[in-house]
Design a protein with these regions (language model features):
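Alpha-helical membrane-protein architecture signal
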Residues: 4, 8, 48-55, 59, ...
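Transmembrane alpha-helix signature in integral membrane proteins
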Residues: 2-34, 38
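Generic hydrophobic transmembrane alpha-helix motif, especially the helices
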Residues: 44-91
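Glycine-rich helix-loop "coupling/hinge" segments at transmembrane-helix boundaries
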Residues: 77, 151-189, 208-210
Length: 210
């Protein structure tokens, strides 16, 4: 029962981390695309957009350059141990990874639909929401689900520094040589990984279908 409860905590940590990273990226990945600021997609070149490009790109680089374990050590220094520090650490690192991937999706978009909208008299706002986001959103969702698969595997790593879930219990059981408990934790961990992989694959198929 304890292992099942810890598995639920681990799953909750991974979902929370992926959701936080996904929402943050969804709000910031457009300024990180170079072709939006320089007018390649049909909009007018903007100096403000160029400044935002370098600022957001630097944020992506910083957050993904620091490993999840280091983020967890820093956050636990300020917060009490639990799944929230682990989710924040995983979310920060994956924010940088997912943000870079999503920005590159926009940079590789076909510019013809947005240029056609601009030629038809669309505003910048209409061009973004009718020409860019509909093209980028399916690939963004696919990348976010891929990162969820990575996050569920990394929860054990941040758990080693008391960030909650199966990782913390795994470290304690290993320290006291309770190998039967270690085997049980690994069993539940494998169930989580396989379950998340299958669910993520199904959701990715839905995203591609849409």
């Amino acid at each position: 029962r304890n292992a099942l409860s810890l598995s639920v905590e681990t799953l909750a940590m991974s979902v929370l981390a992926t959701a936080m990273a996904g929402v943050a990226v969804l709000l910031t990945f457009l300024p990180a695309a170079r072709n939006l600021g320089n007018g390649e997609l049909g909009g007018a070149p903007s100096r403000l957009w160029t400044v935002l490009y370098y600022l957001v790109r630097a944020t992506f680089t910083l957050t993904r350059a620091i490993p999840e374990l280091v983020w967890a050590l820093i956050i636990i220094f300020f917060l009490s141990p639990g799944i929230l520090p682990g989710a924040l650490a995983l979310g920060l690192h994956n924010y940088g990874v997912l943000g870079k991937l999503s920005a590159e999706v926009v940079e590789n978009l076909d510019p013809r639909p947005t240029r056609a909208l601009r030629a038809a008299g669309s505003s910048n706002f209409q061009m973004l929401f009718y020409g860019i986001i509909p093209q980028a959103l399916p690939q963004f969702l696919t990348y976010m689900l891929y990162r969820w698969e990575v996050v569920i595997r990394t929860t054990v790593v941040v758990g080693f520094v008391s960030a909650g879930g199966l990782g913390r219990e795994f470290r304690l059981s290993l320290s006291f040589f309770h190998y039967s408990e270690v085997a049980l934790i690994i069993f539940w961990y494998l169930i989580l990984v396989v379950g998340v992989d299958l669910l993520s694959a199904w959701l990715r198929r839905l995203a591609r279908f849409d």
